[in-house]
Structures are given as C-alpha cells and as structure tokens.
Amino acid sequence: MEELAKKERRAMDPGGLKKEGKVEEEAGKEEGREEEGGEEEEVTSETLRGKPRPLPISALPAFSYIPPRHQGPKERSYFSREGQTGIVSLYDCVFKRRLDYNQKLHRDDREHAKNLGLHINEEEQERTVPVLMSSVYGKRINQPIEPLNRDYGHVSHVKTDFYRKNEIPSIKGPGFGHINPA
C-alpha cells in the first residue's frame, strides 16, 4: 500500500516530494528500493499516452490507400506530372484565405468551382493514355495514326481527265450537252 501511495504522489508531483523537505532522504530510500525490486518507470505524459497502436487488419483498406504525398516519378503518378503545391497546413487553409473578389468565380466558396486555375487539357495531352473519354478524340492530332499515302493520287486525275476529254454527259449537269433528260 505504501508503494502505491508513493507512486500516486510521484505522478502528481513529478519534481519528487520537494514540498516535504526530506528530498534527499526520500530519494535515497526510493533508489535503494528500485534497485532491489527492479527498475520503476518514470511516469510522464508520454508514458501515460502510450504508443499509438496500429489499426487492426480488418480496418486496413485493401486497395484504397492513397499516400498523402507522391514521391515517385511522374510516369507512375495518376496525373502524369510533378506535384506543384507544397504542404499547406490546415491553419493556412482556414485562416489565410484570399479575401479579394474574383468576379469570374461562381458564388460558391470552392477554389476550383468552375475549373479556373486548373489545366486539364495540358494534363490530358501529357498522358500516354487519357483518363477522360472525350480526350481520346483528337488526342493524337499532331501524330496521325495512318501516314498519308499518295500512291493512288493519280487515279482521281485520270478519272477527271478521262471524263473531260470524252465529254461524257452523265458527269455534267442536266440540260447541258446534246443529251437532254426526258
């Protein structure tokens, strides 16, 4: 019982019984007891708080874990580009907001309410496989899928030349030439 009372007093007065005046005597007695009975752990806020326990296996997400900061190469990131923003603290997000008026923004408080400040088209052009389905159309406008083939270009010239020289009236408009439509 006496040891329990001393532990409680020591927890309440971490300075070690300075109020009673018998600091040196009590400290010597306690050290002797600690050596005999084993080491006693000093009670601090860190030991009371303890180490944070890891989550149980059932609480861990299987495939949905997203790391807070992506540090890998840009080819392996979702957006295929380097992160441009640094670490912004919660205090700055809440208390250091821009208070100036932007007339192009919607009345909503969201920062990217109408995608102002975002560069979606540039991100889509940098990706090897586009995320947005609408970006597939015209994705490779600078790089045509099939190279231009001029091998059969002379066919159209031959056809026009043939019909012009032989004056075939079916090519010409109605009522023109010696054959009139019935």
Curated annotation (Swiss-Prot):
UniProt keyword tRNA-binding, yes or no: no
UniProt tissue specificity: Expressed in sperm (at protein level).
A GO biological-process term: flagellated sperm motility
Keywords: Cell projection, Cilium, Cytoplasm, Cytoskeleton, Flagellum
Protein's cellular compartments: Cytoplasm, Cytoskeleton, Cilium axoneme; Cytoplasm, Cytoskeleton, Flagellum axoneme
Domain of life: Eukaryota
CC terms in the record's Gene Ontology section: axonemal B tubule inner sheath; axoneme; ciliary basal body; sperm flagellum
Alphabetical list of Pfam families matching this protein: CFAP90
Chief location bin: cytoplasm
Region described as Disordered: spans on this chain: 1-54
Biased composition (Basic and acidic residues): 1-32
Cross-referenced InterPro entries: CFAP90
Compositionally biased residues, Acidic residues: 33-44
Subunit architecture: Microtubule inner protein component of sperm flagellar doublet microtubules.
PANTHER family referenced in this protein's UniProt entry, alphabetically: CILIA- AND FLAGELLA-ASSOCIATED PROTEIN 90, LOC361192
The protein's role, per its UniProt record: Microtubule inner protein (MIP) part of the dynein-decorated doublet microtubules (DMTs) in cilia axoneme, which is required for motile cilia beating.
General remark: On the 2D-gel the determined pI of this protein is: 7.7, its MW is: 22 kDa.
Name assigned to this protein: Cilia- and flagella-associated protein 90
Organism: Mus musculus (Mouse)
Taxonomic placement: Eukaryota, Metazoa, Chordata, Craniata, Vertebrata
Gene from which this protein is expressed: Cfap90
